[in-house]
């Protein structure tokens, strides 16, 4: 990943400040080390709030544990409630990645998406999901719907790739190559 150095934190702050200055309410998808930076520095959340952007966070369980200051076990016991509560508290759209992904919006909407397979639990798969959501969010005005569509298409791509290659042999590039096919 990009890392969590002071330089990276300054870069994220600069991006968020530019959003604030622009006055445009653009969707922003945050994943991986951006989430780790948010977990470590509450002031970054204030910038996301000031930006007015539709912030979409895409953590896996361990990243969400750091963001929400809870344990993975606590999340497993109460995923729906914690996801919804977090989305409301942080005014973000939360995409909680797992075998069944939960998408929660600050307005209380929740979508449960049991699509995909364990072959998708590979480095780079989350990057494909982030890009998929970002691409859809750039075209839709409803960022919650964009996140749900992105998760669904990503999962369908994974299912198609698994049928062709098997779960154990899947790579992120297989997900990308099947995205166009699931859109037809």
Describe each model-derived feature in a short phrase.
Residues 66, 122-153:
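Short, small-residue alpha-helix embedded
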Residues 70-79, 141-145, 166-170:
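Short, charged, surface-exposed loops that flank catalytic or proteolytic processing sites
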Residues 111-124:
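Short pre-catalytic strand/loop immediately N-terminal to key active-site residues, enriched for Gly-Thr
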Residues 61-63, 153-156:
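Short connector loops/turns at beta-strand edges and beta->alpha or beta->beta junctions
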Residues 16, 56, 80-84, 100, ...:
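Generic hydrophobic alpha-helical scaffold/packing signal
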Residues 156-184:
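Charged C-terminal helix
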């Amino acid at each position: 990943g990009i890392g969590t150095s002071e330089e990276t934190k300054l870069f994220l702050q600069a991006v968020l400040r530019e959003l604030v200055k622009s006055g445009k309410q653009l969707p922003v998808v945050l994943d991986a080390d951006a989430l780790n930076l948010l977990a470590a520095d509450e002031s970054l959340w204030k910038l996301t709030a000031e930006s007015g952007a539709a912030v979409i966070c895409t953590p896996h369980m361990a990243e969400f544990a750091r963001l929400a200051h809870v344990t993975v076990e606590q999340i497993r016991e109460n995923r729906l409630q914690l996801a919804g509560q977090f989305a409301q508290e942080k005014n973000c759209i939360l995409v909680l990645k797992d075998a069944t992904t939960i998408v929660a919006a600050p307005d209380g909407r929740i979508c449960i998406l049991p699509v995909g397979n364990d072959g998708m639990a590979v480095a780079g798969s989350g990057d494909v999901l982030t890009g998929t959501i970002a691409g859809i969010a750039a075209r839709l005005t409803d960022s919650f719907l964009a996140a749900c569509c992105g998760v669904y298409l990503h999962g369908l791509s994974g299912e198609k790739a698994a049928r062709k290659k098997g779960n154990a042999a899947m790579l992120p590039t297989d997900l990308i190559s099947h995205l166009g096919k699931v859109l037809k």
